[in-house]
Swiss-Prot record:
Membrane topology: Multi-pass membrane protein
Record: residues binding chlorophyll a 2: H103
InterPro entries from the UniProt entry: Chloro_AB-bd_pln, Chloroa_b-bind
Domain description: The N-terminus of the protein extends into the stroma where it is involved with adhesion of granal membranes and post-translational modifications; both are believed to mediate the distribution of excitation energy between photosystems I and II.
Keyword Magnesium: yes
Name used for this protein in its record: Chlorophyll a-b binding protein 7, chloroplastic
Binding, chlorophyll a 3: Q138, L148, E215
Organism per entry: Nicotiana tabacum
Pfam families: Chloroa_b-bind
Residues binding chlorophyll b 5: Q166, F263
Residues annotated with N2-acetylarginine modification: R36
Cofactor note as given: Binds at least 14 chlorophylls (8 Chl-a and 6 Chl-b) and carotenoids such as lutein and neoxanthin.
Further facts: There are at least 16 genes for the major CAB protein which can be classified into at least 5 small multigene families.
Length: 267
């Protein structure tokens, strides 16, 4: 393990695929089982990019001060801010970085899923329930919940049926993202490429680096949006578009401050 780590950290391997050969214990039976792991080194981003490197944009601009030594600007979304020291340990940083990117992607999909049905319903498209936090209760209705409105696909009147479908749909994709599959191996679980990039958006390294920054920035906004949707649902019992319409109609009485000052515990 130590030798592999040293080999991967050597600059002479930058940009090349590194193959790790097995030990003798990995050779079993009548034939040889050779296990290889391909590690792809990210191509350096142009020094002119404002989002990477020591001269990148910081969280407070010129008033940010010096960033921690372990925040070098190598990864997208690094603004040099880590007052709690969450990124000081490399292994913890790698884990948290993966968690953030995955949550960003789900939050962007979730925010779209919260707003889009309401938007369609306001434009004449009929839904059983367009408000996101009420939609799940349709499985308890007399007709149940049909995937894509087609009872021959999944006619769900059970939370277990919904759960099973989600495990299959989400678990298969996540498993392929991490471990690869019949369509090809995955060298980077965060940015698998290949079948996950049919448009070839990652073909140009500099454009890809820019897209990574856009993804993490929009994803962070989406996570805050989802938090706001949850709070709105608890406080007002309405969806995000309904709350927006109410606020625009009467911004003085329909805002966060008004609801906070009118809140009485136990009522």
């Amino acid at each position: 393990m130590t030798a592999s780590t040293m080999a991967l950290s050597s600059p002479s391997f930058a940009g090349n695929a590194v193959k790790l050969s097995p030990s003798s214990s990995e050779i079993t039976g009548n034939g040889k089982a050779i296990m290889r792991k391909t590690v792809t080194k990210a191509k350096p981003v142009s020094s002119g990019s404002p989002w990477y490197g020591p001269d990148r944009v910081k969280y407070l601009g010129p008033f940010s001060g010096e960033a921690p030594s372990y925040l070098t600007g190598e990864f997208p979304g690094d603004y040099g801010w880590d007052t709690a020291g969450l990124s000081a340990d490399p292994e913890t940083f790698a884990k948290n970085r993966e968690l953030e990117v995955i949550h960003c992607r789900w939050a962007m999909l979730g925010a779209l899923g919260c707003v889009f049905p309401e938007l369609l319903a306001r434009n004449g498209v009929k839904f059983g329930e367009a408000v996101w936090f009420k939609a799940g209760s349709q499985i308890f209705s007399e007709g149940g919940l049909d995937y894509l409105g087609n009872p021959s696909l999944v006619h769900a009147q059970s939370i277990l049926a919904i759960w099973a479908c989600q495990v299959v749909l989400m678990g298969a994709i996540e498993g392929y993202r991490v471990a690869g599959g019949p369509l090809g191996e995955v060298t980077d679980p965060l940015y698998p490429g290949g079948s996950f990039d049919p448009l070839g958006l990652a073909d140009d390294p500099e454009a890809f680096a820019e897209l990574k920054v856009k993804e993490i920035k929009n994803g962070r906004l989406a996570m805050f949006s989802m938090f706001g949707f949850f709070v709105q649902a608890i406080v007002t019992g309405k969806g995000p578009l309904d709350n927006l319409v109410d606020h625009l109609a009467d911004p003085v009485n329909n805002n966060a401050w008004a609801y906070a000052t009118n809140f009485v515990p136990g009522k």
